[in-house]
Amino acid sequence: CPMLNAGYTVAEVIYDTTLEKMEKSIVKYLEEFDPDCGLGTGTNYAGEGPMLELERPKNMRWAGMPGDVIDVNSIQQFIEYPTLLDDEFDEFFRDRTGWSLFKQAPRNSDFLVPLLKTLQGGRVSARSVAAQVSTPEFKAMLEDLWRLNELNQEYRKNAARLNKTVYEMGYPVFRQGGAAVPFDSYSDGLRGTILSLQDLYDHTEEVERYIEESIGPMLEMIRMQGKMPGAKGKHVFMALHKGIDGFMGDEHYRKYYWKHLQMIIEEIIKADMVPYIFCEGRYNTRLDCLTEVTPGKVFYHFEEVNMEVAKSKLKDIACIAGSFNTNLLQFGKPEQVRDEAKRLLDICAPGGGFIFMTGSGLSHVKKENVVAMFDTVREYGKY
């Protein structure tokens, strides 16, 4: 973890709104290990602590938050629960905006509750609105919104400075945007893992309707990303949450997951960008599906897969990476790290189409093991 390597706690970096601690952490990492590409603020919420406190999410815990709920060096933790209840499907599809405002938003955060009170039913007049927006709660919410905007503007300015520093050091940052499979959005944001699986049997029509209504806007969002300055050739990142082996059978996977993931991948390609597909969890049974894309255009990053099989199936179709278990970097010895790195290189390097990457982030790992990994790839991985 670059932050820990630089001597900072995760909490310190999350609450440093200048992003100077994050920048120093990244610069130290790049100077010490010289990887092939740079890093940005990533997904560790660097500099976002004060904004998170204002937003008050109910489904998230982060290092340094009031009450010290989790360890100062823990990555963020998410609490999954349904925001769309069993008896709300009709309301959800009839008026998604209203449902999102009055049902989902308060379940995710209390931040906008004063605003929601002003929007609920009854006769509207200038005087009634004036009374509602003059309450202490509403005024406090407005002040929080203004402060949140100030913090966000500062964050964006500092993030741009950080990226500029990385570029000037000679390291490209490839990521341009993001996308999501509709079923993942349904499961992650509305129903939760267990209920979304049950819904494949108990609420089949509702799942299908949500997916079909969501795929169009997702494809349009990708087209808009492709029109942004400098987008050509950049990565559009997608983390696949619910496509893992065993979560759903092959028939369900193809119908509710792969069909729309495939559409998104091809739309990213049409937009002259690169689909960066991070396959979370074990992905051995999904490899045949992953071959059904335009050859030479897709990058698959695996958390856990049989790389021999992945290489044999995808070698002429996509670039592959990952499946180096970071537990080895945390608990193993340098010699074990070197042996595993060599094994992966022997399997995946022949013929190209392989980028050496770990299966997940470098969190709480031994520095000597990271050094052993980088040295082995440089020495043993030469073509």
Q: For the regions a protein language model found, what residue spans apply to each?
A:
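Catalytic cores of TIM-barrel enzymes
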Residues: 1-383
